[in-house]
Amino acid sequence: DSEWISTLLRAGLLNGSFIPEKRIREFRDLNRYRKSVIRDITSQKNRIEKFLQSSGFRLSSFISDIFGASGRNIILHLIEHGQIDKTALDSCLKTKTRNRIDEILMSVNGTLSEHQKAFLRILMTHYDSLKKHLAEIETSLEKDMAPFALQVEQLNSIYGISTTASCAIIAEIGIDMKPVKTAAHICSWAG
């Protein structure tokens, strides 16, 4: 095989691989890691929601985002007190969700033991650390993307392409398309 490949190479029948410049490859690593951390956050949110439901707290039945302001206030109250009454629930809810306080109260009728409160605290601490880690990654990404502001702006002008998508595109294929023969080649390479 190696003899055949060397023969093809000497005959000029092999094309070089497309490899973006170093700073693009480094940016790609960070961007892919960002996606991994987002998956970790989603898994942790699902773990917390499952734990709450198994403990008798069906927050997602009445609160669309249990990690939003109202949901988070309820979770923090449960960590401290293990249960919640109507007065405490009213102080945890924001204006929009207060209209459904009686329905929400029925969905949070469980009680957490000391072990469950400690476990929920651990779960939330891990969730918060993942969110903080994601913010650090995004700060690094913004700094790394600064030299590509013009390209990001150009990509954003395409309908449906957000800044996040623009960054992902640049991270995967770079900005120099000279080594690429056709659009089909870059599509094939990028997947």
Predicted regions: what they are:
Residues 1-191:
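A detector of single, family-specific signature residues
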